[in-house]
Regions:
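Short amphipathic alpha-helical segments and helix-helix/interface helices
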Residues: 12, 70-71, 138, 192, ...
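Short, surface-exposed alpha-helical segments at coil->helix boundaries
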Residues: 8-9, 67, 259, 263
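Conserved N-terminal boundary motif of the eukaryotic protein kinase catalytic domain
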Residues: 19-27
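Helix-rich C-terminal or lid/interface subdomains of diverse kinases
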Residues: 61, 128, 132, 172, ...
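An alpha-helical support segment within catalytic cores of ATP-dependent transferases
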Residues: 4-18, 90-92, 102, 143-214, ...
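ATP-binding pocket architecture of kinase catalytic cores
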Residues: 26-164, 206
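Active-site acidic catalytic loop and adjacent metal/ATP-binding pocket
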Residues: 35-41, 54, 193-244
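Short beta-strand segments
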Residues: 53-57, 84-85, 153, 211-214, ...
């Protein structure tokens, strides 16, 4: 992914132009493809003394989805930070603002800072007791009211999914431009086998239409060590089978220890039937294929190799 490298003074200038004087501006842990900072601003009305977060990204799309998710789905059982401002950083040196190709002026998104740390940053011995609260949060997420939304798969800031059915979303991974990935013959043979398995399993996957976060379980979940205090970054959110979120935990379990802990919890609690196992396999392969394609196009060789090997192992699980 292309990570922004916008100088802090440029970000402060954009915030002060929109919100007035900014105080306590400090960096936070970066996302995979974004920057993040905490701050306070006088122009936030009654919330002026509350801490806020500003994130910087080359695209606005994910920020608009964050705003949509906060307005539509936030409630006591599903804490989603309210978005207070979205804009562009105008004052910067373009050539030094990105790792990789130039994409134009980046966007910023200001949201209320929720308490807690990310699950990924939590000491591992504290993650186990959170497995049940995490599962309850996924249940709450899946129970969200989708009235006024349409479609399946990834949706836009208006709640419109890109596909007419869940099966269509799953099978669409084969329609990506795989020639642009420039994989060698051995890697492409593996991808073709995995695409065939997805096509074989997709018709048996239920046409459920519920809210799916799409990237749940590590840096996008906040906790105080007892409960879940925030679910953030809705850029990958979609409509479909909520088991897709569990499959994401399974796919990434070798990569992050906190995902392994959650995966083990669901291994103990999910139905032990062939249908559930087939859905998990299908969804993991789908997640992996998307990761392979994205990494190949971004030129991320190490991540690409990991994803290729991970998907090969999943494909071998009969």
């Amino acid at each position: 992914m292309t990570r922004t490298r916008v100088p802090a003074p440029s970000i402060v200038a954009a915030l002060e132009h929109a919100l007035g004087p900014v105080h306590g501006f400090v960096p936070l842990a970066e996302g995979e493809d974004s920057q993040a900072f905490a701050f306070r601003a006088e122009g936030l009305g009654s919330a002026a003394q509350a801490e806020h977060v500003v994130r910087i990204h080359r695209s606005r799309e994910g920020f608009d989805k964050d705003d949509f998710a906060a307005r539509r789905f936030a409630r006591p059982g599903l804490p989603v930070p309210a978005v207070t401002a979205i804009g562009r950083v105008e004052d910067l040196s373009f050539e030094q603002s990105f790792e990789g190709p130039f994409f134009g002026k980046p966007f910023y998104c200001v949201s209320r800072r929720l308490p807690g740390s990310t699950l990924q940053d939590l000491p591992l011995d504290l993650v186990g007791p959170l497995a049940a609260p995490l599962a309850r949060t996924l249940e709450e997420l899946a129970a969200s009211d989708l009235a006024g939304t349409t479609g399946f798969g990834r949706f836009d800031a208006n709640g419109t999914g890109a596909h007419a059915s869940w099966r269509a979303f799953l099978e669409a991974v084969a329609e990506r431009d795989w020639s642009a990935a420039r994989l060698d013959a051995q890697a492409m043979a593996g991808v073709e086998r995995q695409l065939a398995i997805v096509r074989e399993l997709a018709p048996s996957c239920p046409e459920l239409r519920q809210l799916v976060h799409g990237d749940f379980g590590s840096s996008n979940v906040l906790t105080d060590g007892r409960e879940i205090t925030g679910v953030i970054d809705w850029s990958e959110a979609l409509f479909g089978d909520p088991l897709y979120d569990v499959a994401n935990l399974f796919f990434w379990r070798p990569w992050l220890a906190c995902m392994e802990v959650q995966a083990r919890y669901f291994e103990r609690t999910l139905p032990a039937d062939a249908g559930t196992a087939a859905r998990l396999r299908c969804y993991q392969l789908h997640i992996g294929l998307r990761q392979i394609h994205d990494c190949a196009l971004a030129g991320e060789a190490e991540d690409l190799l990991w994803a290729l090997e991970r998907n090969a192992r999943i494909a071998d699980q009969a």
